[in-house]
A protein has these predicted regions:
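Active-site metal-binding motif and surrounding structural segment of the metallo-beta-lactamase
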Residues: 43-89
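Active-site neighborhood of phospho(di)ester-bond hydrolases with catalytic His/Asp-centered motifs
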Residues: 35-39, 60-69, 84-86, 159-161, ...
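Metallo-beta-lactamase
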Residues: 5-6, 96-159
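A short catalytic or substrate-binding loop motif that flags glycine-/basic-rich loops and adjacent residues
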Residues: 17-19, 140, 161-165
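Short loop/helix-cap segments at secondary-structure boundaries that form the rim of catalytic
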Residues: 4-5, 73-80, 149-151
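Active-site-proximal loop/helix segments of hydrolase catalytic cores
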Residues: 154-193
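Conserved beta-strand hairpin/beta-sheet module of binuclear metal-dependent hydrolase folds
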Residues: 3-50, 169-183
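Active-site environment of divalent metal-dependent phosphoester hydrolases
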Residues: 41-43, 68-74, 90-93, 164-167, ...
Length: 193
C-alpha cells in the first residue's frame, strides 16, 4: 500500500530520501478531506493520488502547506483543489515563483546563497527538466492560526516557526490525537543550524 493508515481518518505517505520527497498527510472528514503538503513535484502528487485510489479514499479538497521549501510546495500547481498557507509562507512562495530554472539561474542562486546544494542536487534528481518547475502561491492565506471543520474531525493550523524555518506551520487533528509537523523540528539546512 502506498499510504499508511494511522486511523480510519488519518493516513500518510512516507518520505523518499533519494529525491527528497517528504512525508505527505491526509485527513478524511465527513464533509471534506485535507492533504498536508503537496509534495515536491507533480509526479510525487500523482503517486499520492494513486495511493488514495488504492484505498478507496476521495481526493482532498484542500491542501495545507507546512512551509515554503521546494519539497513541500512544488506540486501546488498540480494540486486539484484549494491550497492553504500562512501569510509568511505565501510571501516567500511569491518570491520563489519569480525564480528561473535554467542551469545558469540555479547556479547563481547557489553562489548567492539563495539556494543550497542539497536542494539543487535533489531537484535535479526529481525533475528531468527543471525548467518545468512552476511555483505558485496559495489560494487561501491565514495569519497565525486557522481551524477547519472537516466534519467529525478538525484540522487546527498554527504558525509556530522553529529551528527548520521561520514559516513552519503545524497541523493538529485533536480528535485523532495526531500532529503533522512538516519539518518544524528539523535543523535549518540553509543556515546549517
Amino acid at each position: 500500500m502506498i499510504l499508511r493508515e494511522i486511523s480510519d481518518r488519518v493516513y500518510y505517505m512516507p518520505n523518499t530520501e533519494e529525491t527528497d520527497r517528504p512525508t505527505l498527510g491526509y485527513i478524511r472528514g465527513d464533509f471534506f478531506s485535507v492533504m498536508v503538503d503537496t509534495g515536491n513535484s507533480p509526479g510525487h502528487l500523482k503517486l499520492f493520488y494513486e495511493g488514495l485510489k488504492e484505498r478507496g479514499l476521495p481526493k482532498p479538497e484542500f491542501a495545507v502547506i507546512t512551509h515554503w521549501h521546494w519539497d513541500h510546495t512544488f506540486a501546488m500547481k498540480a494540486f486539484e483543489g484549494t491550497t492553504i498557507a500562512s501569510r509568511m509562507t505565501n510571501e516567500i512562495l511569491d518570491n520563489v515563483s519569480s525564480w528561473k530554472w535554467t542551469e545558469k539561474d540555479m547556479k547563481m542562486r547557489l553562489i548567492s546563497g539563495e539556494d543550497i546544494e542539497f536542494c539543487d542536487i535533489h531537484i535535479k534528481k526529481e525533475y528531468e527538466n527543471p525548467a518545468d518547475i512552476e511555483v505558485v502561491t496559495a489560494d487561501i492565506v491565514f495569519e497565525n492560526e486557522l481551524s477547519i471543520n472537516l466534519g467529525g474531525v478538525h484540522c487546527n493550523l498554527k504558525l509556530v516557526g522553529g529551528p527548520h524555518c521561520e514559516d513552519s506551520t503545524i497541523v493538529h487533528i485533536p480528535e485523532e490525537k495526531v500532529l503533522f509537523v512538516g519539518d518544524a523540528d528539523c535543523i535549518d539546512f540553509y543556515l546549517k543550524q
